[in-house]
Amino acid sequence: LVSSELKGLEGFATAYGQFPPGHYFYSRDKDFTRWYIRDWMQYDNVKDNPASVEELHDALEAAVRRHLMSDVPYGVLLSGGLDSSIISAITKKYAARRVEDQERSEAWWPQLHSFAVGLKGAPDLVAAKKVADYIGTVHHEINYTIEEGLDAIRDVIYYIETYDVTTVRASTPMYLLARVIKSMGIKMVLSGEGADEVFGGYLYFHKAPDAKAFHEETVRKLSKLYMYDCLRA
């Protein structure tokens, strides 16, 4: 039996396991086989690659633009940090025109909405508002209380299906924010998730003994995103 959520298997089996992303399962082999393998996962394949800020800029902009091919209203999650601010700025650049027809016609919803969530007075909210004002989004600041956060924890755990403390803590405000976004009719949002894993943005990356260890840790973090940060997203 296979289900997209653990709760869908309740009552049908006595043992459960994860179906890892990038794998397929063949019953005859009784094991998972990895099919998603890219050259860049191996350090030796990338160690001599030249670094190009221009190519990185163009690739990121193209990736964001590609994800704006949407027939439903979309927005951006804007925390005020570097990752989400860059994604929001690129999205705003293309939001007024339909990317499906090479910007020949206006978008059905030309005003880009940005969203930030936090306790009242949180510094992240101040930073998010500054970015929103600068790039020109219709900004929504969602405040919640500690009591509201505590009340939501049971539902959060039900949906993300983990008791991991860090994941639950990060998912709780996201859950409260998602309810507001849904009520506004926004069907899709872009965020800055994954940037720290790709670029080694976490503080402990500074302790990497060499470039090979740094690269291998970024690949490992990317492979585990589905278990942690992508759960909250």
Regions found by a protein language model. Give the residues of each.
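Glycine-rich active-site loop/lid subdomains used to bind and stabilize high-energy intermediates
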Residues: 29-30, 129-233
